[in-house]
């Protein structure tokens, strides 16, 4: 297999060569974030902040679907990369195929269960009489498109592991551009509201999904689908290795509910709209960390699978330098650019604007710590140690965050809500540093 990220020796490891993988991976993450943000801008501009709040309320459902996709995509791709590094093609194909089939089947079952109880679930998530109609419209589209949503995410990761990060980026870019164009037509020109926004998003995902299928039929370098010797055990192995991503998405779903309900009690529906804006902007900044970490992860897996520990350590030295500098730059950008960024979603005279600006500046303190936490989790997953990855993610995204969301608002009010994330990330960092010790065979 010709793959730019399989290094024969420590001397071959160069940052410029590594960038061939990191840059497309980061751009994929960045562009996914950008077109999600543009989605929000179209909705808030042409439909209103209540519609934006409706989408935010539905996000826990989207997070469940995304979580199912990511648990198999990240876990399965890491296991597959370990097999590729060890030159074990049959096992790599089996891991890839088992992950894909299991993820899509599970996603369809979960979507069906949610659809049959949609009204009750949306009420639990915080839908009000003002937002319930928009919530139902947006949620139904996502649930009905579950196979495409999950398949697109799977292909993004496995195409990258197959040694084609640029093609993976092109699939995301193509779907995103179609989404933006359709947002302009359906939401901006045809005034189709949330229905149009949902349709635009799903059609963009369909394009990316179709390009993924085309790749594995006509352009694959190493991996291929197989029905031979597929086993539940292999699917479970991949799922457990990627458990941290499901924990992350499930945690986002739960904490979004708590965020919405807590902010609702302090600032009403304007506060919920502000949370939506903060979440959009968070994706933009935190995407840098995910892009770098996921970009370097396959190289770590290839080297570890081939027992080339010195290569792993050299790769990690680049990561240490990156995370010594990037968090400071990202927080500085967050602090100074927040007013401009928020004005893309809400008018400066809107009551939503000051809530979002002040909230983002406090919330953004978490970016000083989250990069190392994210890398530590993805690093352990790349080495096939998903249980440690899951622990880091569980702490930062769920346990500590939920604890601080309950405790800090009692003392600091609305500011306490925004402080919960930095507090959770800072405490998790103490654990993450321990997991960044040198790896051994």
Question: What are these model-derived regions, one by one?
Answer:
Residues 64-67, 179-183, 208-213, 283-287, ...:
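Hydrophobic transmembrane alpha-helices of multi-pass small-molecule transporters
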Residues 25, 29, 41, 78, ...:
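Transmembrane alpha-helix boundary and packing residues in multipass membrane permease domains
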Residues 34-53, 122-129, 185-192, 253-284, ...:
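Helix-terminus/linker motif at the lipid-water interface of multi-pass membrane proteins
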Residues 73, 142-160, 168-176, 197-210, ...:
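Short runs within selected transmembrane alpha-helices of multi-pass transporters and secretion channels
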Residues 10-47, 60-75, 79, 83, ...:
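N-terminal transmembrane alpha-helices
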Residues 20-39, 141, 175, 204-208, ...:
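Transmembrane helical elements of multi-pass membrane transporters/channels
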Residues 52-112, 149-168, 274-332, 336-338, ...:
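Small-residue-rich hydrophobic transmembrane alpha-helices
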Residues 1-22, 80-147, 189-243, 300-366, ...:
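Short alpha-helical transmembrane segments in multi-pass integral membrane proteins
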């Amino acid at each position: 297999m010709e793959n730019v990220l399989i290094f024969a020796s420590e001397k071959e490891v160069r940052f410029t060569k590594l960038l061939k993988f990191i840059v497309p991976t980061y751009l994929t993450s960045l562009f996914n974030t950008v077109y999600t943000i543009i989605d929000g801008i179209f909705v808030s501009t042409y439909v209103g902040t209540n519609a934006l709040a409706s989408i935010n309320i539905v996000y826990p459902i989207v997070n469940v679907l995304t979580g199912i996709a990511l648990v198999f995509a990240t876990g399965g791709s890491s296991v597959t990369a370990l097999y590729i590094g060890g030159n074990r093609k049959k096992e790599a194909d089996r891991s890839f195929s088992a992950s894909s089939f299991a993820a899509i089947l599970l996603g369809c079952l979960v979507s069906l269960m949610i659809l049959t109880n949609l009204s009750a679930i949306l009420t639990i998530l915080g839908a009000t009489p003002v937002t319930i109609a928009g919530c139902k419209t947006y949620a139904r589209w996502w649930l009905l498109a579950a196979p495409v949503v999950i398949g697109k995410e799977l292909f993004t990761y496995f195409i990258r592991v197959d040694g084609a990060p640029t093609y993976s980026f092109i699939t995301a870019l193509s779907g995103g551009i179609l989404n933006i164009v359709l947002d302009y037509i359906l939401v901006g020109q045809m005034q189709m509201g949330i229905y149009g926004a949902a349709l635009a998003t799903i059609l963009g995902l369909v394009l990316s999904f179709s390009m993924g299928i085309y790749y594995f039929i006509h352009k694959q370098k190493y991996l291929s689908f197989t029905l031979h010797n597929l086993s539940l055990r292999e699917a479970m192995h991949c799922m457990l290795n990627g458990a941290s991503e499901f924990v992350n998405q499930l945690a986002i779903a739960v904490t979004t509910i708590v965020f919405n309900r807590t902010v609702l009690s302090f600032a009403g529906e304007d506060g919920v709209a502000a949370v939506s804006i903060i979440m959009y902007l968070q994706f933009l900044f935190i995407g840098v960390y995910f892009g770098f970490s996921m970009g370097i992860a396959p190289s770590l897996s290839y080297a570890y699978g081939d027992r080339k520990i010195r290569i792993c350590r050299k790769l990690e030295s680049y990561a240490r330098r990156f995370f010594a500098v990037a968090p400071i730059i990202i927080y500085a950008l967050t602090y100074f650019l927040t007013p401009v960024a928020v004005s893309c979603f809400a008018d400066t005279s809107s009551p939503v604007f000051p809530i979002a600006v002040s909230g983002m500046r406090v919330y953004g303190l978490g970016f000083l710590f989250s990069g190392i936490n994210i890398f530590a989790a993805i690093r352990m997953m790349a080495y096939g140690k998903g249980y440690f990855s899951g622990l880091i993610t569980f702490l930062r995204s769920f346990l500590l965050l939920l604890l601080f969301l309950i405790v800090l608002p009692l003392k600091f009010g609305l500011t306490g809500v925004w402080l919960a994330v930095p507090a959770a990330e800072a405490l998790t960092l103490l654990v993450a540093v321990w997991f960044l010790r040198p790896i051994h065979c």
